[in-house]
C-alpha cells in the first residue's frame, strides 16, 4: 500500500503510473500527456462521486448501502466504457480487467474500498480506485497492452470490518453476521441479504480464487492525517506495517443519579468525573508510550449520558467507546 498526501489530485492520479508503470511511460515518451490527462480525469471522477454521496461536510458511503452501491455501479460503467472485462466475486467486490499479453501469468491487482466512514473524506478509498482506473484508461487510449492482466478492484464494506476482502478470502466468522456498524445500522447478515449475497461461501475458509493467480496487489491511499501533508519534502510514504485494532464499543461507568444542587462533592458518585479521569489516565499513558519510542494511538469516539439526562442532574452512568491501535500487538493489548 502507498499512502499519498490528502487533497492532492495530481499525486492521486499519477503516482500509480509513475511508480509502477514508469517503463511504459519511457517507452511511450508521453508522460506529460499522461499526467495532464489523468489529473483532469481524476478530478472529474472525484467530484462525480462526491455529488452522489455528499453528507454534510463530508461523504457517507456505508458498506453494502445504497451510496456504496452507487460508487460500485459508477465504476462498473466506466470500466465498460473502457472495454474492461467485468466480474463480481461472491462478496460483491468488483473486478475490471485489462487483458495482458500473457494471460497465463498471475495478474497485477490494484484498487481500494468503495465505502467510507460517516461524513468521511471523499478521497478515502476512492483515491485507490481512481489511480488504477486512470492508468487503465490511459493504456486503453494509447493502445498499450500490459505484460500480464491488470485488474482494478473495488472492494466492499472495508470500514465496517474489511468484510469485502475477508469475504473474498472466505474468512468471515459466524458471529460477524450479527455485527452492526452503528447501533442503528442493520447487521452484516441483513446487509448481505439485502444484496442477495449468500454468507456460507464467505465463511468457508476457501478464497474465491487461487491466490497464486495474483502476482501483486497495490493499494494507493491518502494519508488521512497531517504528517505528509505538512512536510515540504516527504510527499509519498511506504507502509511498513499494518496496525492491529482493539475496539471496545461500549464501556459503562456506573454512578448514582442525584440532584446537581443537593449533593456535596464528598458524597457524589459521578460517572462523568470517573470516566473523565480514566480517559485522562489513558492520555498520560499514551504520552509516556510515545516518549519511550513506541507508537500507538487511542481514541474515545463516543461518550454519552443516558437519554433522559439533564443539565441539573448527576447521571447514573456514562457509556463510552475506545479504539486502540498499534503495530506491536503486545503494546496494543496492554492498553486493552
Language-model segments: residues:
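Short helix-loop-beta-strand segments that form the rim/entrance of peptidase-like active sites
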Residues: 139-160, 291-301
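N-terminal hydrophobic or amphipathic helices/low-complexity stretches enriched
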Residues: 21-59, 99, 314
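A non-catalytic alpha/beta surface segment that caps or lines the substrate-entry region
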Residues: 51-99
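Catalytic-core environment of secreted peptidases
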Residues: 78, 82, 94-127, 132, ...
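Intrinsic, low-complexity polybasic segments
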Residues: 14-15
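Short, conserved charged micro-motifs
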Residues: 329-335
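Midchain, well-structured core segments that form catalytic/ion-binding scaffolds
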Residues: 115, 161, 166, 170-329
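Short glycine/serine- and small hydrophobic-enriched flexible loop segments
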Residues: 133-141, 277-284
Amino acid at each position: 500500500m502507498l499512502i499519498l498526501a490528502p487533497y492532492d489530485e495530481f499525486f492521486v492520479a499519477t503516482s500509480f503510473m509513475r511508480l509502477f508503470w514508469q517503463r511504459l511511460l519511457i517507452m511511450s515518451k508521453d508522460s506529460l500527456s499522461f499526467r495532464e490527462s489523468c489529473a483532469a480525469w481524476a478530478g472529474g471522477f472525484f467530484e462525480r462521486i462526491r455529488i452522489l454521496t455528499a453528507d454534510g461536510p463530508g461523504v457517507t458511503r456505508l458498506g453494502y448501502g445504497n451510496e456504496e452501491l452507487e460508487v460500485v455501479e459508477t465504476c462498473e460503467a466506466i470500466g465498460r466504457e473502457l472495454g474492461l472485462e467485468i466480474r463480481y466475486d461472491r462478496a460483491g467486490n468488483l473486478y475490471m480487467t485489462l487483458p495482458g499479453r500473457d494471460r497465463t501469468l498471475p495478474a497485477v491487482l490494484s484498487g481500494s474500498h468503495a465505502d467510507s466512514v460517516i461524513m468521511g473524506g471523499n478521497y478515502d478509498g476512492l483515491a485507490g480506485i481512481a489511480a488504477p482506473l486512470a492508468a487503465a484508461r490511459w493504456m486503453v487510449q494509447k493502445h498499450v497492452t500490459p505484460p500480464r492482466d491488470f485488474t482494478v478492484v473495488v472492494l466492499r464494506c472495508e470500514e465496517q470490518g474489511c468484510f469485502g476482502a475477508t469475504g473474498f478470502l472466505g474468512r468471515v466468522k459466524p458471529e460477524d453476521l450479527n455485527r452492526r456498524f452503528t447501533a442503528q445500522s442493520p447487521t452484516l447478515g441483513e446487509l448481505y441479504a439485502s444484496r442477495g449475497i449468500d454468507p456460507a461461501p464467505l465463511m468457508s475458509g476457501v478464497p474465491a480464487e487461487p491466490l497464486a493467480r495474483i502476482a501483486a496487489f497495490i493499494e494507493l491511499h491518502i494519508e488521512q492525517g497531517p504528517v505528509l501533508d505538512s512536510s515540504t519534502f516527504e510527499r509519498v510514504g511506504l507502509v511498513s506495517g499494518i496496525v492491529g485494532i482493539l475496539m471496545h464499543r461500549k464501556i459503562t461507568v456506573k454512578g448514582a443519579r442525584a440532584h446537581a444542587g443537593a449533593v456535596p462533592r464528598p458524597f457524589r458518585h459521578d460517572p462523568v468525573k470517573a470516566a473523565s479521569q480514566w480517559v485522562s489516565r489513558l492520555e498520560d499513558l499514551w504520552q509516556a508510550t510515545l516518549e519511550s519510542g513506541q507508537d500507538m494511538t487511542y481514541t474515545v469516539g463516543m461518550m454519552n449520558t443516558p437519554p433522559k439526562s439533564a443539565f441539573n442532574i448527576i447521571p447514573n452512568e456514562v457509556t463510552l467507546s475506545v479504539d486502540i491501535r498499534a503495530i506491536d500487538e503486545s503494546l496494543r493489548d496492554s492498553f486493552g
